[in-house]
Amino acid sequence: VAKFNVGGPDFTDEELAGWLGNYRGDLTIINTASASGSYIREMAKPGRVVITATKNEGEISFTRFGRFFAEAVGGLIDADLDNDQQVSLLESFLFASNRVALFYKDDTRLATEHALIDDNGDTLGSRAEWFEGTTPTQTPSAEAKPDGDLAAQKVLVKNAFEKRLTPEQTKQRDELERQVVALRRSKSSLDEADYYAKLESLLLELARIYDAVGDS
């Protein structure tokens, strides 16, 4: 059990999970403290992004993940992996994880923190090494779905174009992008003509949204 230090009685990850148990909206939980890994197990649910600095509550040493994550999420250009002039939560996680790994490597020390991200609700979490760019290439198990899709669409400091999207346009765009990702992952099981026809349809719908924003 991991505890969160606050003024007054500390509370546990299990207690926080209980308080948020009936919350039905989108939720992002970022715990950059040591021993934070259990928050993946306790807090992960569909529609949530959970990021922790450690892989379990046994990693109790001082963590450096939070410093690098804070730098990235504010819009650090080096963290913008897809070059869209903004930095998503996924990109921030990947950047911070890689910087942590470099810190320990350059200091010739054994790494005592291994960050995790979970945004598919399976409570398993994924490591930064399991991504190539922003594309997941590995999952915790053969049956598990990849993490990262939801976190890739969440941005704290938006670019100029993103600011012009209405909430409804953002919702439509995000859903279409998720459909494109799902389609690409199923490419091997589809007829080639069928695959490209479906992809073209989705991309045209995305283009209509972008055109509408450009004309506004």
In which residue ranges do the predicted regions lie?
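A short linear-motif detector with a strong N-terminal bias
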Residues: 8-9, 28-32, 161-162
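A short, glycine/acidic-enriched catalytic loop
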Residues: 1-22
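Structured segments of extracytoplasmic/periplasmic soluble domains
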Residues: 19-26, 42, 71-79, 95-106, ...
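Second-shell loop/turn segments in exported
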Residues: 2-7, 53-59, 79-83, 162-170, ...
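Disordered regulatory segments flanking catalytic cores
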Residues: 109-216
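Active-site-proximal C-terminal subdomain of hydrolase catalytic domains
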Residues: 27-127
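Extracytoplasmic/secreted envelope proteins and their assembly/folding machinery
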Residues: 13-20, 36, 48, 62-70, ...
